[in-house]
């Protein structure tokens, strides 16, 4: 416990020093995270509209292509990092839980493939890739819900973006390749 307390004290003392090295847009991003209502038409607009859209989805959502915040252009760039906002508005709490369940199954299967793999590289890759997918999902959903600052983290498989989609598909291809390689060793 004394290590945690001493680490916390060092962090508190060092924070003002590190803040002096931040660029103005980085400082604005941090300030917007703590108080988005301070600039509701500027830096805080995206996160405020995101929270409104997620909340307006309610329990069962508004229906496919019937989201008001998203399709009346209150939510800019909804197809990129804020795709979860659009999904939550259209499919509600039930759809969001369903999406989390699908992602959980995907991560479980990736970790499972790593656990049965006999190749050390495949094992490490699957564990690392499963963790990476989990972190991207957690950061994106936390960002959309206002629990973390907006950092531009895509939601795997759903967000619009060529490089993110390509990297995700290559990673899933390596995972599937390790599964096929495992089957060939057994057979």
Annotate the PLM regions.
Residues 1, 105-115, 175-182:
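Structural signal for the C-terminal ends of transmembrane alpha-helices
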Residues 3-96, 120-122:
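Hydrophobic, glycine- and aromatic-enriched re-entrant/interface helices and adjoining loop segments
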Residues 9, 86-89, 129-133, 161-164:
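Transmembrane helix-bundle signature of multi-pass membrane transporters/permeases
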Residues 26, 103-110, 130, 143, ...:
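Hydrophobic/aromatic residues in alpha-helical transmembrane segments
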Residues 90-108:
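Hydrophobic alpha-helical transmembrane segments
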Residues 112-152, 158:
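Loop-to-helix entry and N-terminal half of a specific, functionally important transmembrane alpha helix
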Residues 140-187:
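A juxtamembrane structural motif centered on a specific transmembrane helix
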